[in-house]
């Protein structure tokens, strides 16, 4: 079992503890530099965590929130990660936070990625907190097995920023921060729930190619220790 494994009795206990830990990191960044940055994942797992975090007492006006990855769909779309964050995180005190979306109303995903790279550069580097998720295929962010630009996304020499990704398991074209943008976050979290994902994590921790299970790049090569939060 990983040295940085945080195990909870249930998803609500996890959501509260992760919100406490992320809130404390953001508060420390604000105290040190006057601002804080947070990149979160989409999908079904982070909803309860988002709701808990939105209630944490912080000077949210000094926090900038963005996404680790996004579908190339407008925020009105049910599958938009922007929409998930707007509905569950950017409320209560956290409504004061600045949100920088990855989706941009551009003609192509490539054009949107270029705009998103420029806009997210204002968050500075490294990011203070990054919360990753993981799919049962071993993807994290939009680093999908078989992804069109997986090699480039995982290459540590690829610059910080947002690139496009297409993959069979991804549905829509995606926008994703590169590995280099995420791996050195001040607090780097992997949030997973359920016995299925615990088994996937165990598989990822065993030997094998990063291309088969891209989460391995974070487990093996991230400059910051990956803090794994899990509940059944
Ligand atoms: O496609 C995505 O899926 C992963 C995992 O989602 P979940 O529904 O299994 O929690 C997520 O981390 C990523 O941000 C999202 O775009």
UniProtKB/Swiss-Prot annotation:
Keyword vocabulary terms for this entry: Hydrolase
Classification via InterPro entries: 6-phosphogluconolactonase_DevB, Glc/Gal-6P_isomerase, NagB/RpiA_transferase-like, PGLS
Reactions performed catalytically: 6-phospho-D-glucono-1,5-lactone + H2O = 6-phospho-D-gluconate + H(+)
One Gene Ontology term from the biological process aspect of the record: pentose-phosphate shunt
EC number: 3.1.1.31
Pathway(s): Carbohydrate degradation; pentose phosphate pathway; D-ribulose 5-phosphate from D-glucose 6-phosphate (oxidative stage): step 2/3
Keyword Transmembrane part of the UniProt annotation: no
UniProt superkingdom: Bacteria
Listed GO MF terms: 6-phosphogluconolactonase activity
Function: Hydrolysis of 6-phosphogluconolactone to 6-phosphogluconate.
PANTHER family: 6-PHOSPHOGLUCONOLACTONASE (PTHR11054:SF0)
Family listed: Belongs to the glucosamine/galactosamine-6-phosphate isomerase family. 6-phosphogluconolactonase subfamily.
Record-given protein name: 6-phosphogluconolactonase
Source organism per UniProt: Rhizobium meliloti (strain 1021)
Lineage, top ranks: Bacteria, Pseudomonadati, Pseudomonadota, Alphaproteobacteria, Hyphomicrobiales
């Amino acid at each position: 079992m990983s040295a940085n494994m945080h195990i909870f009795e249930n998803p609500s206990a996890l959501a509260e503890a992760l919100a406490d830990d992320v809130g404390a990191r953001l508060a420390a960044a604000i105290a040190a530099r006057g601002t804080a940055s947070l990149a979160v994942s989409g999908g079904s797992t982070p909803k309860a965590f988002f709701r808990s975090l939105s209630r944490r007492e912080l000077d949210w006006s000094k926090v900038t929130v963005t996404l680790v990855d996004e579908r190339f769909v407008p925020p009105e779309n049910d599958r938009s990660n922007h929409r998930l964050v707007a509905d569950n995180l950017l409320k209560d005190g956290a409504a004061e936070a600045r949100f920088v979306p990855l989706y941009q109303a551009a003609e192509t995903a490539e054009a949107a990625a270029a705009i998103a790279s420029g806009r997210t550069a204002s968050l500075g580097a490294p990011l203070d907190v990054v919360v990753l998720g993981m799919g049962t295929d071993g993807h994290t962010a939009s680093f999908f097995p078989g992804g069109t630009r997986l090699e480039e996304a995982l290459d540590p020499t690829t610059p910080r920023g947002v690139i496009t990704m297409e993959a069979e398991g991804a549905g829509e074209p995606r926008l994703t921060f590169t590995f280099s943008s995420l791996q050195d976050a001040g607090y780097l979290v992997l949030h997973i729930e359920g016995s299925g994902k615990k088994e996937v994590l165990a598989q990822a921790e065993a030997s094998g190619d990063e291309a088969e299970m891209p989460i391995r790049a974070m487990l093996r090569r991230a400059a910051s220790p990956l803090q794994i939060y899990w509940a059944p």
